[in-house]
């Protein structure tokens, strides 16, 4: 049977109880098994790095996923999902380095690669367990006992198979290119891994001396002085006009400079020249015959071996000088120019960001620390035209936050540029939520994508499965562990990690020996293969053929250049199509001011802290309702508390009828809706219609992943329709006799609504939904499904839908609100009855609503009558005051205006208004018996209310409250005041609903006492008083005695249990 619940919503208690219930009943497995015959839905979880505690962003991400999957499950989808864990790469290595106190790769080498690998593995596995428990506390249902983990050999094989496909399709390339490089981590990083942040760097203008021309220089600008020792050329735009001009200083000295004609003024300003003379103009292509000298040739000997020329490049912009310094070893654009013109790829910088011996005098210096040294050397040699600083967005390593540099190194690449067109076609075949996530943001990223550098010079990662013969240089790509074991002749199994896999060699046809290249995969390649690796492909095709590609994925908008992109690239290589059918892109979590959360700013919010304080359902409901999924979520503590209050209201709504239902032994299995249909009131039919409308609205919202609309719809229904309206309407019905059909109808309707609401909230607030379900359904029906999450999603029952009634009730609620406002103006509380409410409707629909819901209006406005005026007509008891307008009367009647104004004030307002409307004028009799003609505009009109009446506007029209008191109304008002205080005292004594009491009330004011005595029976009935003593001088005693001021009247009340 239905049981009472605690008065207060205790999230911690409920969540512990439900977690244990799910565990004991094996609810997750049974729910998935229950849907095995449904339509398949394959979901791939974007794997978080196992680096520690979950943060608010990862919590939001998992909550979105869980809510959507629960919704799909209830809609009979057979779901395959496995939580994923990204367990390799710099994210893990950097954490472990921090634990071990390491500063560089040298520390790792000294510690031992195998030792370091084991530490990384241990860290990743331990953190996975901790994060799993945190996600489970969020109420997230996934196959936590069988996740996919990127460190597992079978997972690594999926990546190896994909790379072999790339090799066989000529989409794998190896070679020297200038790539993003982290000098702390000493590895290449992909474009998608570069994080941009504001940084202040040097800004210098440098003069390169033109060979064979005295005192003549071409001027370049750079923010990386450290790259000057690696300069091999200057690039100019073929279509720009350039000038050779004499630049004159204040002291009369001069020099001849070359720059874009449009930028001469900037060069003069930067160099503090006072005048200039153009000697010659030319196009960029005319400059290519010139050569120049390195400004640091005496410091960097290798520079003297280079023929420094000027070359054409379309990417040169009309900024600074229009001439770009080219160092092919330190920039992708520079590298491409170098390749195009067969220039030397000079890269005198080592992997740790320090100059090599090739840098001459700069050898051993860190390049960033060398900036001021290079600048000073240029100054000493009169090659520094100007020096300043610039604050700009500059790339940093995504994990250690070190500013990147560009280094020309040998790397492995997927030739994305060869399949870019097919990738763009694949994007169009995917359903994107929102649409612009694919058509704009993602498409733009792919259009600008370069070949993907998939190699990393690190340790803890999936080894790149390429074996190279040291003798002949032949390469072999291995696709599976079995292939490796066979070709290497290994006698036993091997773990597919460094350094273990590095020990296996493969005989080469030339008689030499192939050894594995040392690089590991870019960690983004790990997760790129998740959709087939989680299906155990390529070990088996069974699951892959049944489920792949993924029906749905969702991640943050940074994944347009991360996981969405890496998956698409790898899948196009492996299968020639997108690995997902639909994608929901969500936003970032920020603080209330819109700033990114970071420890340095002290604005980080822990989801676990929020759960500890408010509960998981509150956090879930908040993050889901706060904003559209694709907008950034600005975490606001006050809004969290508002959601918590809403859930408390939901709990109280749920709790309200339970004591009465339990007391009356209400059994919903024995009372069907059909059996009470004749006892249904309009408000019952209305709430049944409203819950259908809510189901429809939530369904529509979920179809487009408007999760915020879905949750808001539910919370608003609970607060506005249930708590503030329907519960108030039916409250008196729950106090009647147990077998009263009117009460049973209210119980059965409320039960129906609760059952539907329980299922509606279950994807979003799973703990609370389960608690409600177990009490309302499982306690009533032993044959019911074990969990609410096994239930079917509610279907709209068209028989209950009544849009006309919903509109009418909306009108009625507006009238009630207006009546409340009018009561406030009249100084009459709602507890005090009024004789009548007058409604002056503006439309027939409004009038019909009043007629249809008259009893509701009488009850909720606490009035004895509802008076309805004819549509469009004023209430006939209103007065119409005439207000003369002296500004219009004076110019017409001049000295007689003083007679006209008082005469107008005495005229019947309705007669005057009618004359103006029908005749356009009015003959006005003055005090001296003369008449004058007045016209519209000379008078304004103001409605006047009968004494003791107040009014307010509603959506239906004007509402009037007659607040005049009769003795009968006053008696009821005082009686209601007494009842309210006695009810409060019952609550204070924590009495059960049906417990009878003894009451004594002393009212010293004899007149008020006589009024209250006329309703003694009503008071006794309402407060369940078996004995009620009233008097002006009686002794008041009991378990609880209190003094009260009731509308200025002193009263003393005492109550005791019977």
Swiss-Prot record:
One BP annotation, GO: isoleucyl-tRNA aminoacylation
Pfam families documented for this protein: Anticodon_1, DUF5915, tRNA-synt_1
Chain positions of motif 'HIGH' region: 48-58
Necessary cofactors: Zn(2+)
UniProt xrefs under SUPFAM superfamilies: Anticodon-binding domain of a subclass of class I aminoacyl-tRNA synthetases, Nucleotidylyl transferase, ValRS/IleRS/LeuRS editing domain
Keyword Transcription regulation assigned: no
Residue ranges annotated as motif 'KMSKS' region: 596-600
A GO cellular component entry from the record: cytoplasm
Record key words, sorted: Aminoacyl-tRNA synthetase, ATP-binding, Cytoplasm, Ligase, Metal-binding, Nucleotide-binding, Protein biosynthesis, Zinc
Subcellular location, record wording: Cytoplasm
Biological function: Catalyzes the attachment of isoleucine to tRNA(Ile). As IleRS can inadvertently accommodate and process structurally similar amino acids such as valine, to avoid such errors it has two additional distinct tRNA(Ile)-dependent editing activities. One activity is designated as 'pretransfer' editing and involves the hydrolysis of activated Val-AMP. The other activity is designated 'posttransfer' editing and involves deacylation of mischarged Val-tRNA(Ile).
Similarity annotation: Belongs to the class-I aminoacyl-tRNA synthetase family. IleS type 2 subfamily.
UniProt protein name: Isoleucine--tRNA ligase
